Structures are given as structure tokens and as C-alpha cells.
């Protein structure tokens, strides 16, 4: 009830202005352990059936917050109090950048979806690292999503990813290379097996922490499988599928620029994840993101082969009790099908 009133006010504002107001509050809350504990007591949820050890990291539950919400790693402590099993900060770039011109964030309310053309706006890796360290250590795993600066030519992209990774080596529990945002010109062209191979070979020499590749939902299936195979062969530990889509047919009144996320992406993301899991389940850690807004969809992705999940748009539309609701209902679904834990359900449809 309370969030419905808050949401009504926030949705009366420009989408990015509303986000900035929320972020300001979350940054303030992050500085208070007492308030974070209070939030956790209200909206957190713990159940041993949802715990899992993946790549040497302990996840209290499989539901994470996707990159893009906390671009500068400045409000992680507050965000984790809302029940997330892990968080992904960023996207951070080597140098600070302002992103694309506003307006660049839009709501498609009927479809419970968002469209963003942000363009990796962030304070840069150095300040991102400083923000991260301010409230460390954290209770859950934290991923760091890394991107390429807009002004960097394609020929120097590998050097740019190396530079941003180098600055972030002493923060985070895993790293995600973002080659799939539609909002940096030509970035998606780097989704090819040659560049991906070079990228992960480089990263493996720099860190022993888990490395992930985040892919677009708009790839042809054969291309996607080829790119993923190249990444895993070069040392990637996991694949995050998917980023936002440029398929404007999924909403009634799309804006010209930007990628779509939310419920409009559910079917498309599920379909590409199904193909990904058929080929790479048990060969890599698979993370499903895109249009997950309830326990039923979360459970389907887990049975399809997802060890972990991520949400973003649903958090905007449903508010602070979303994680708790999904996780409670997920436990009920596991029990109904006779699974003793979420670990047993991962990939059940493939067995």
C-alpha cells in the first residue's frame, strides 16, 4: 500500500529524475547500518533451501539485482537489505563519462517495461572503487560490470577493458564484461568470437576471480552459441543472458533510441536462455535475466538451467517487497515439486 503511493508520485516524474531521487535516499540509507538492518527486518528473507555455493561464493539466494541500477557502487549496502542474494554494480568504465543526452530513460507502463539509452554514464573506475570500499565488506557477493568508454575506438577496445579491469581488481567478487549494451555505438560489434577470446584470455591472466560475459538477446542463435563457446574456451566462468533488446516491436509506443527491459522481454529472453542452456548447462554457470517478475518465471528459468537470476525493471514496478515475495513463493514451488533445495531444481528440465 505504501509503495503504491510512493510509486504514484515517482511515476509522475521523469523516469531518470525519479531514479535519481531514489538513489539519493539509498545512498543515505547505506551510511546507516541501523537503517539497513531495519530494512532487512522488513523486506529481507532468509531460507536455507535457497542457499548455494557457486564458484567459491556463497549466495544466500539466487535472486540478484542486475547492473545499471547502482552504476557507481554507491548504495550497495542499502540495496542488499531488500532481500537480494547478490548485486551487480556498474557499468563502470575506465574514465568517467556523462552518457547520452537526456531524456534517455522511459517507462512503458502498460507493458511494465523500461527503455533506456543511458550510455554507461558513471563516475569512472577510480571513483567507483572508492564508493565500493566505503561500505565494504558486504554480506552478499558483489559483481562488477565493466564497459568500454564511448570515445575509445574499436581497435583499442581490448586495452580499454584491460584498463578498467586493472583499476577494479581489488574490489568485487566477480567481473562481468558488458559487450551487449545497445547504447554505446558499435559496442555490440565486439560480440564476436575473436574479440571475446582475446578478452577472456587477457582477463584470466589478470585475476583468479570468476569472469562472466553478458550477451544480447538479439543475436542469432548460432552466433550466440559460437560467441559463448569462444568465451568459455578462453576461460569465462559464466554467461549472463540477456541484456536489453533493440526489438521495438515488443512495446506499443517505443522510443527511437535505447534498449527495452521488463515484461516485454520475458519471452525473448527465455527463448535465448533455453538455447544457451541446451548447449552449455553443466559446462558453465548460467545466469538468466530479462522479464523475470514473479516466482513462477524465476522457477522456470532455474529448471531451465539458471544457477542464478537477475531482476531490474520488476524492482521498479513492484517495489521493495518484490524479492521477499518471489523468494517465499519460490520456496513453495520447490516444496510442491519435492525439491529439498534450489540446488536440486537447477536444470531439472534438462535431466
UniProtKB/Swiss-Prot annotation:
Cellular component terms per the entry's GO annotation: cytoplasm; plasma membrane
Domain of life per record: Bacteria
Assembly description: Monomer.
Similarity comment: Belongs to the dihydroorotate dehydrogenase family. Type 2 subfamily.
Record's catalysed reaction(s): (S)-dihydroorotate + a quinone = orotate + a quinol
Residues holding substrate: 71, 116-120, 178, 183, 243-244
Entry keyword set: Cell membrane, Flavoprotein, FMN, Membrane, Oxidoreductase, Pyrimidine biosynthesis
Essential cofactor(s): FMN
InterPro entries: Aldolase_TIM, DHO_dehydrogenase, Dihydroorotate_DH_1_2, Dihydroorotate_DH_2, Dihydroorotate_DH_cat, Dihydroorotate_DH_CS
Manner of cofactor binding, per the entry note: Binds 1 FMN per subunit.
Membrane topology (UniProt): Peripheral membrane protein
Name listed for the protein in its UniProt record: Dihydroorotate dehydrogenase (quinone)
Molecular function per GO: dihydroorotate dehydrogenase (quinone) activity; dihydroorotate dehydrogenase activity
Species: Helicobacter pylori (strain ATCC 700392 / 26695) (Campylobacter pylori)
Predominant localisation class: membrane
Active site: 181
Binding residue positions for FMN: 67-71, 91, 145, 178, 214, 242, 262, 291, 312-313
Gene that this polypeptide is encoded by: pyrD
Entry function: Catalyzes the conversion of dihydroorotate to orotate with quinone as electron acceptor.
Subcellular location: Cell membrane
A GO biological process held by the record: 'de novo' pyrimidine nucleobase biosynthetic process
